[in-house]
Amino acid sequence: MSDIAERVKKIVIDHLGVDADKVVEGASFIDDLGADSLDTVELVMAFEEEFGVEIPDDAADSILTVGDAVKFIEKAQA
Amino acid sequence: MFDLTGRKALVTGATGGLGEEIARMLHKQGAVVGLHGTRVEKLEALAAELGDRVKIFPANLSDRAEVKALGEKAEAELGGVDILVNNAGITKDGLFVRMSDEDWDSVLEVNLTAVFRLTRELTHPMMRRRHGRIINITSVVGVTGNPGQTNYCASKAGMIGFSKSLAQEIATRNVTVNCVAPGFIESAMTGKLNEKQKEAILGAIPMKRMGAGSDIAAAVLYLASDEAGYVTGQTIHVNGGMAMI
């Protein structure tokens, strides 16, 4: 796993209080990890803070899984 | 009951009569209190009088950058704001047909937009901590209206709608958002009224007297307390029966 993926995973675990083994690339924040709509907003804000990137609302709407988040951040930092 | 030991509160407009009473009450119940105001000397005097557990935060609420900075500073220096009391407010009264853009804008800016901006700064950390109390001081006239105060009443009614919406958004995070709506309260503002005006006002109040700042502070204290954890999106009217809503 890349460094970014590790950091994303840690944020998700901390924020949602879920088991580490559930936080896999294809895990959906809402369907698999029990997040509500506020959680997803908070996660996006946490990613922005951690990685110093800006995630616009329309991009945020397309970040549905752990893998989506990692991909977006990798792209934004490239 | 209503013990605030360990809680950190920020009260805006703490140099005004009402804000000062609110700050005193929260402090008395054990909270660390951040006093916001525009007059540094008055803030320092009140802080000195209260003694421990007090910090002052001078800021101009009509300056948007200062509002943001106030939120950041209070959050950092108080070590997390648990209780936010949006009390600061101004009036620029005048009959509607003669109301200037400036009088409209300045009242909405301080009474409503600053509330939005400051609350936005402090809400997210509250959500993270899964605890928070946001208490907005509105007014009976925000519900009943009052001639000569279209701007003020719009801002106070706006505060109520704002509070209800935000309350619904963040209820699952244990952050409550409520309003306290004072009626006529003895203050520097009402002290300026002449006898005839006073008589007319008292005639409309079943209790035949004006309220005291401490009456409002007590309602704020309740909403700030752990005991009020199941109360959100509400407006508590404290007005001697003047309007029963």
Curated annotation (Swiss-Prot), chain A:
Its main location: cytoplasm. One of its GO terms (biological process) is lipid A biosynthetic process. GO terms for cellular component: cytosol; membrane. The keyword Lipid metabolism applies. Residues 2-77 form the Carrier domain. Pathway: Lipid metabolism; fatty acid biosynthesis. One of its GO terms (molecular function) is phosphopantetheine binding. The modification O-(pantetheine 4'-phosphoryl)serine is found at residue 37. Keywords: Cytoplasm, Fatty acid biosynthesis, Fatty acid metabolism, Lipid biosynthesis, Lipid metabolism, Phosphopantetheine, Phosphoprotein. It is found in: Cytoplasm. It holds the Pfam family PP-binding. 4'-phosphopantetheine is transferred from CoA to a specific serine of apo-ACP by AcpS. This modification is essential for activity because fatty acids are bound in thioester linkage to the sulfhydryl of the prosthetic group. It comes from the Bacteria. InterPro entries: ACP, ACP-like_sf, PKS_PP-bd, PP-bd_ACP, Ppantetheine_attach_site. Carrier of the growing fatty acid chain in fatty acid biosynthesis. This is Acyl carrier protein AcpP. It comes from Agrobacterium fabrum (strain C58 / ATCC 33970). The gene is acpP.
